[in-house]
């Protein structure tokens, strides 16, 4: 059972608007690459990809906006959820023991695993990019295998 707000928030019309918003934000995130000319072919990964050495300031902004801020927001939200889960048994009367439903816990755990996988997969590439942006000479000292592995 979910709240009455759910039907209003996720109506067919609103869902279409959310999808359009996601695509608009995606295009908005890509457009600056054309002006900075940061999309270049990289023979190490055999692909056209974001060149971290084109503009240090731009690379730092990309890492902050597309990785650090989302990780920070999601971490904050998960901490709030865990704090709430820990505090709920203390707020409820001792004789009535609320139990977390198995499907609620499974859903929470699934979303947490998705978050951890996002962080684990994107952290190496973003931290290498941030290191190269802050110290450009460091780019030559990063082993090619490490750079290539960060893409996979």
From Swiss-Prot:
GO-annotated molecular function: melatonin receptor activity
Alphabetic keyword roster: Biological rhythms, Cell membrane, G-protein coupled receptor, Membrane, Receptor, Transducer, Transmembrane, Transmembrane helix
Cytoplasmic side: 1-13, 80-111
Record-annotated membrane-spanning stretches: 14-34, 59-79, 112-132, 145-152
Keyword hit for Lipoprotein: no
Taxonomic superkingdom: Eukaryota
GO cellular component: plasma membrane
Induction entry: By cocaine, which increases the levels of day-time expression.
Membrane topology: Multi-pass membrane protein
Chief location category: membrane
Location(s), subcellular: Cell membrane
Extracellular side: 35-58, 133-144
UniProt GO BP: rhythmic process
Similarity annotation: Belongs to the G-protein coupled receptor 1 family.
PANTHER family from the UniProt entry: B2 BRADYKININ RECEPTOR/ANGIOTENSIN II RECEPTOR (PTHR24228), MELATONIN RECEPTOR TYPE 1A-LIKE (PTHR24228:SF49)
Known function: High affinity receptor for melatonin. The activity of this receptor is mediated by pertussis toxin sensitive G proteins that inhibits adenylate cyclase activity.
Name under which the protein is recorded: Melatonin receptor type 1A-like
Organism: Danio rerio (Zebrafish)
